[in-house]
């Protein structure tokens, strides 16, 4: 072994070592190896603001073995033979810098190589063209990391102290939550209007075709008058227009467009998309998956062109070079594409293969000819003397589209032809059925993960490496939920003319039904309002985008890191210092819903420690108030007295178990449940108001069975042998010890359990600690 190459991921280490041969040994750092300390031993701040934001780093405890192995190998080959091959983005550059620091490698001379795909030619070429660590990229990554840590470190305690149920606040996540909250309020305020849309089914030469009237009616009366006027009317073709058209393929994928398309076409979340893309990249099947470039290399274009010509013929090939619109994009980088365009199957994993197929087809389509179309519009005049007067003549229009050459649609997209009968101007057509149906304007659509990524990109918030993390974080914190909405049924008026008479009917239509949309929780709305009122810059879209631009300037050596950080931190910290004057009682207003007729006490909807809730009675009254959660789908502003009274009927005695214990149904912090003695059983998606005794007993029995499987043994002093998420273990309530792999947990005696507890170093059992922020906790010490 003469050379050591250090990569980020162990998954790609073997592949790269195979390409480089016996003179190279490839090891992995397994991602980041150091992070900013959470707390220093001497109490000094982890980030010294006064000293140009100097940050103190520490090796992550779980990476100590990795570092030991790397140091041993560095010593074996010599520092001059170490190659840093971490990823080609800013995070990768920062990891390379940290490796230099921890492994005592000279930053000025240590060889740094980058590649956007894991192929033999690319790896070999990278070895021939090494550079050194780019400190501008490192500084940009550090600026982001320091800024995000400062915001979290100083703003989160304010949120804990001032916002009921507040968890934390992030610099980039908070504007994303605000976007979702604003969209939700647009939907809530939306007042729809209805109109009547008229469609007709005509017949010519035994072929039916559909046409739409060129005007809509605001009232049922107007629509009815129009349909009745058709009783003596004739329908004559007055014009036939045919226009050629083309449809061009989209550019190859960037990180953003891949997440959008995978969400739309495959139903993948942003996190799942990036996980599959990471695996495909590590396996050498696609190029680097974090990019905002739509550029393809000349070699990639040539390979795609050759493949298209051989498979489909020269008419299907059109060479294209797409121009990246993003100002921050680096054209030296490439779009996401297959490393071998001829490879159809890249993975045995169905999710990875679906994503690969999407990437491959999009890449091929980008180098294929436009689709050619012929669009036909047939205009049909209404000849009759009873037509109501209107500003423009009432006409029906039938539209058809025929693909005359499929081009790129051969591999990506594809439309069905919309055929029309062969007609000539002056031909008379017969109406088979004419309908005026009530339609309603629609409110703005809730964001999907894909459409939110698109909006963030449009606003300049975040970068390719951060979109998936942003969306995952706001859901993890409980500010946003991905949910389905069943929608509501509504009555729709339908007027129908069958050639003889006009009939009226009412049909049921479901509206507002959605799947997989992002919905802000009440806590999300509260945190967005709080930050908008008191920390405007944190949720301001333009400000957040400008910060991203400044990171780009640091990366391009056009701005000093300390200058940028001071520009953000100084006004931000001033707001933190002023936050002590914020009145917590005015954050998240209370609302009296009504009076409970049984107790004559007020029912109040308000925010509590875990989010919105209902309170029966005053906190300063003689009796302690009762509490209940809000009904599903209700908000503090909208919950009714009837809904609230229903919630206070809980807990409800459903019945008894077979051995005579009461079964109580209720709703708690984590949803609906039943309780038998000290045992709690989730009953999602059952309703505690209506769950039957039979169903409750069934769920209770299943829980008992699961608990029995979990408890392997229990001794009189409280020591237990349990089956856990990560395998069998022993616990005494304060200490957990993993059972050795060669030991059967069922054979462990009390003495053996005590021996393992006393001789094994173990982590204490986790207990939730709620920190209470002091008045000065938000201030920089």
Positions of PLM-derived features:
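Intrinsically disordered, low-complexity regulatory segments
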Residues: 1-146, 154-155, 214, 313, ...
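Basic, low-complexity terminal or inter-domain segments flanking catalytic cores
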Residues: 2-3, 15, 74, 132-133, ...
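Conserved nucleotide-binding/hydrolysis micro-motifs of P-loop NTPases
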Residues: 10-13, 30-36, 88-92, 116-121, ...
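C-terminal or mid-to-C-terminal helical accessory/interaction module adjacent to the motor/catalytic core
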Residues: 118-202, 242-246
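Metal- or metallocofactor-binding catalytic centers and their adjacent structured scaffolds
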Residues: 218-253, 259, 424-430, 437, ...
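Short acidic, hydrophobic short linear motifs in intrinsically disordered regions
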Residues: 237-240, 248-262, 287-291, 443-455, ...
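A conserved hydrophobic secondary-structure block that centers on an alpha-helix together
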Residues: 261, 265-269
């Amino acid at each position: 072994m003469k050379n050591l190459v250090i990569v980020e991921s162990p998954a790609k280490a073997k592949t790269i070592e195979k390409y480089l041969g016996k003179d190279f040994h490839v090891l992995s750092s397994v991602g980041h190896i150091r992070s900013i300390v959470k707390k220093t031993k001497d109490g000094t701040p982890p980030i010294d603001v006064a000293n140009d934001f100097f940050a103190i780093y520490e090796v992550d405890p779980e990476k100590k073995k990795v570092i030991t192995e790397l140091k041993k190998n560095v010593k074996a080959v010599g520092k001059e033979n170490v190659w840093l091959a971490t990823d080609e983005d800013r995070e990768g550059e920062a990891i390379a810098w940290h490796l230099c620091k921890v492994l005592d490698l000279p930053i000025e001379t240590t060889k740094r190589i980058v590649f956007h795909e894991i192929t033999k030619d690319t790896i070999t070429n990278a070895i021939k063209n090494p550079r050194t660590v780019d400190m501008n990229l490192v500084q940009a990554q550090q600026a982001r990391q320091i800024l995000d840590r400062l915001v979290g470190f100083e703003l989160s305690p304010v949120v804990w102290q001032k916002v009921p149920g507040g968890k934390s606040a992030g610099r980039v996540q908070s504007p994303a939550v605000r976007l979702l909250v604003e969209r939700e309020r647009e939907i809530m305020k939306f007042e729809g209007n209805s109109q009547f849309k008229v469609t007709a089914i005509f017949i010519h030469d035994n072929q039916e075709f559909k046409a739409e009237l060129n005007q809509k009616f605001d009232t049922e009366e107007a629509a009815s008058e129009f349909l009745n006027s058709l009783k003596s009317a004739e329908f004559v073709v007055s014009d036939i227009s045919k226009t050629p058209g083309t449809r061009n393929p989209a550019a190859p994928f960037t990180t953003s467009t891949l997440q959008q398309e995978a969400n739309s076409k495959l139903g993948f979340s942003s996190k799942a998309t990036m996980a599959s893309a990471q695996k495909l990249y590590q396996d050498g099947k696609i190029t680097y998956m974090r990019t905002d470039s739509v550029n393809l290399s000349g070699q990639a274009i040539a390979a795609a062109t050759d493949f298209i010509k051989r498979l489909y013929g020269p008419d299907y090939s059109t060479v294209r070079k797409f121009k990246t619109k993003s100002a921050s994009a680096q054209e030296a980088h490439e779009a996401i594409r297959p490393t071998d365009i001829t490879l159809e199957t890249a993975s045995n994993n169905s999710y990875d293969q679906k994503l690969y197929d999407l990437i491959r087809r999009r890449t091929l389509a980008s180098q294929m000819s436009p689709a050619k179309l012929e669009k036909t519009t047939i205009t049909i005049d209404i000849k009759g003397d009873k037509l109501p007067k209107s500003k423009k003549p009432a006409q029906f229009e039938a539209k058809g589209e025929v693909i005359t050459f499929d081009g790129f649609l051969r591999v990506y997209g594809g439309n069905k032809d919309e055929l029309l009968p062969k007609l000539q101007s002056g031909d008379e057509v017969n109406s088979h059925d004419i309908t005026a149906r009530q339609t309603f304007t629609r409110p703005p659509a809730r964001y999907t993960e894909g459409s939110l990524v698109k909006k963030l990109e449009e606003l300049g918030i975040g970068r390719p490496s951060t979109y998936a993390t942003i969306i995952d974080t706001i859901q993890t914190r409980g500010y946003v939920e991905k949910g389905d909405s069943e929608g509501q049924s509504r009555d729709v008026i339908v007027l129908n003319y069958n050639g003889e008479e006009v009939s009226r009917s009412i049909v049921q239509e479901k509206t507002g039904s959605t799947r997989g949309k992002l919905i802000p929780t009440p806590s999300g709305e509260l945190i967005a309002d709080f930050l908008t009122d008191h920390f405007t810059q944190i949720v301001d879209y333009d400000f957040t985008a400008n910060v991203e631009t400044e990171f780009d300037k640091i990366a391009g050596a056009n701005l000093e890191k300390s200058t940028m950080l001071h520009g953000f931190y100084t006004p931000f910290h001033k707001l933190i210092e002023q936050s002590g004057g914020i009145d917590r009682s005015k954050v998240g207003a209370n609302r009296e819903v009504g009076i409970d007729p049984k107790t004559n006490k007020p029912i109040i909807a308000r925010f509590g420690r875990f989010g919105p809730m209902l309170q029966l009675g005053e906190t300063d009254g003689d009796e302690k108030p009762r509490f209940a959660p809000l009904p599903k789908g209700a908000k503090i502003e909208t919950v009714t007295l009837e809904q609230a009274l229903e919630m206070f009927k809980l807990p409800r005695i459903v019945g008894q178990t077979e051995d005579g214990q009461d079964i109580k149904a209720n709703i708690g912090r984590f949803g609906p449940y039943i309780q038998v003695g000290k045992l709690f059983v989730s009953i999602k998606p059952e309703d505690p108001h209506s769950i039957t005794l039979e169903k409750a007993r069934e769920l209770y029995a299943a829980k008992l069975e699961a608990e029995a499987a979990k408890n392997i043994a229990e001794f009189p002093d409280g020591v237990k042998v349990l089956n856990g998420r990560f395998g069998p273990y022993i616990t005494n309530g304060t200490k957990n010890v993993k059972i050795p792999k060669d030991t059967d947990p069922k054979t462990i005696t009390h003495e053996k359990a005590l021996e393992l507890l006393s001789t094994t170093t173990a982590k204490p059992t986790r207990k939730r600690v709620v920190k209470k922020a002091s008045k000065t906790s938000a201030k920089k010490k």
